[in-house]
Amino acid sequence: MKINDLLEKASTSSFSLWLLNFVLLRNIPFNKPHRLKIKSISKNKVLIHYPYIKNNLNHLKGLHACGLATVSEYSTGLLLLNHLDPDKYRLIMKSLHMEYHYQGKTGATASFELDTDWIKKQVIDPLLSSDAVFVDCEVKVSDDNGNHLSTCSTKWQIKKWDKVKVKI
C-alpha cells in the first residue's frame, strides 16, 4: 500500500489512522522514542500529538525545544505528502525557524493547515516553468491547556524527481 493511499484512508477510518501511526513509528526510527501520534489528518489539516513523557523533556521538566521543532517539521512534511505523490516529487527541508512562546508542562499538539488551491498556486503551477520551488509552512504548537508554545516556519524545497541531479 502506498503512503498516499494510507493517508487518504486515515482521514475517514480510525483503524487506518492507527495503522498509519503504526507504520510511521516503525519507518521513521528517529521519531519512535518521541511517540508522536497523528490525532487526525485530512487533505487540509493535520494534528499531531507530542506527549509529555520522559524522552520528550528537557532539564527543567518542560517539553524539549528540539522535540517541538521535530513535531512541527513532521506535520508540514506529512501534509505536503498528502497532496504530492512521493513518486513524482522530492521534498527536502531547506530551513527551519522556531519561536518559543511558553514552556510546555503538558502534552502538546502541532496543527498545520493548507488547501489544494495553495498547493496548485505555490507548487504545481510554478514547477511547470521551474526546476524547483521553495514554500514556507507555518505550524503552531499548543499544549493540552491551550497555551501557545511555539511557532515554526519550515521552508521546503520541492522538485520533480526527473529534475533531481543526484540520484539515490
Model-assigned labels for residue ranges:
Residues 32-37, 94-99, 122-124:
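Short structured motifs
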Residues 55-76, 89:
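Hot-dog-fold acyl-thioester-processing enzymes
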Residues 1-15, 104, 115-168:
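HotDog/MaoC-like acyl-thioester-processing domains
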Residues 79-117:
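Hydrophobic beta-strand-centered segment that forms part of the acyl-chain substrate-binding groove
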Residues 33-62:
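Catalytic strand-loop segment that frames the active site of acyl-thioester-processing enzymes
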Residues 1-33, 55:
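Alpha-helical membrane-targeting segments
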Residues 32, 92, 108, 133-135, ...:
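Hydrophobic core residues within well-ordered beta-strands of beta-rich domains
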Residues 47-49, 97, 109-113, 136-138, ...:
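Beta-strand secondary-structure signal
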